Amino acid sequence: MGAHRSTLRSRRTLVPAVMAAALAVATAGCGSSSNSASSAAGGAASASHSSSGGGSTLTVADVAPFTGTDGALGPTYLVSCDAATSAINSAGGVLGHHLNCKSVDTRGDPADAVPAVHQMYASGSPSLIIGCTSDEAASVVPVFGANKTVSFCMTGQAEFDHVKFPYFYRLVPPDLSESYAMTAMAKNKGYKRVALAFGNDIGSQTFVAPAIAAIKKAGLTLVANETLDLNSTTFRTEAAKIAAAKPDVVMTEALGPSEASFLTELKQLNGGKMIPVIGTSATISPDWYKSVAAAVGASTLASNFSADNLVTQTSGPAYQAFSKAMFAEKGKVGSTGNFSTYLTAPGAVHLYDGINLAALAMTAAHSTSPSAFMPYIIKIGDGAPGAVVVHSFATGEAALKAGKQIRYEGPGGPTNFDAYHDSAGLFQVDRYSPTGAVTVAGNLSVAQLRALGL
């Protein structure tokens, strides 16, 4: 899931080095730093890992960018965290504990993320961590592991496909899969000439190499490949090169205000006509829509935009519980465009599911200790033969109290964890309506992706 910080180094060179460095310092204590790590719920610090109920507060830490070029990611995740924990608290909490959410600002930079995480642990270990985007995951996931804290992360980095981190879980696909999905979308639309325009941050750049490979395998032509400096205020040079290449479609991810500026200039240099755009799932976001629609026009964007996204529920009991929990937070969130976009935003959907999975696992294990409840995450997510399917914490807790085995299926659909704790489903094609509502235009089959070599 694209996320982020600029680097000109190969990420495959950078990530192992960062992981090694993080492992080296993970046990060195919680020394330095005064990065942002403020409680979003105004509640108590995190609770210790107790083995039974006791009324103390369990903290869910949202470790993600709240400032910087990717500063919209953390707040999106926090809305989902508040929704999930409020619903859990309304059902009585976990083993007598209520939950709260705490923001930890990584600023989208490993150099800021590691000290911010140490500061977080210095103030009390969280019971669960969410967020951890591609900006900082490689540097902070080893620290989470050293502190034996379960995390549900949004990183799409391919390294997590084949490196085992026992406390790490992921409900979103690697960026490689998304690149193939975007290419399949372009091929299905009959586009022949493709341009790439991705931000110079870590998360966005992870899409580029697999996209180039997928475009070649699909028999399409790559006519331009431009990197957008997210600290820049104009992209006229990059836009001019792409306009001159005459692509049928532009595949892109550039978060923050950059995308709006780039697409505005590209439209101007293309004779006032917007070139069709295929975005990553990160572009399904209230903030992204609000800025880009204001720049190019809501109707123009609706006619020329699509994005890949994981298939999510849009009706039924899981969707109803999720929608109710999310809309309960609406009045607490500032103006971010169409609030209903949160119901399909990957970070909102899959982190909500992650929090519910962890809470139900604690309930099943009768313990908030990670060593005790971790095995139940996969047991409850993947289910066992004869397990009762539940769609919320409240219904899951009731079934567990009745002595039943359960399988949790939330708005993100059923899970299927592999040996690396990854679980990713099928892709759908999303579009925006002129009012900013997300609509599903269709699905991508496994056969379509495999035809490109995925």
Identify what each model region corresponds to:
Residues G2-A22, A26, C30-L454:
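Extracytosolic ligand-binding ectodomains
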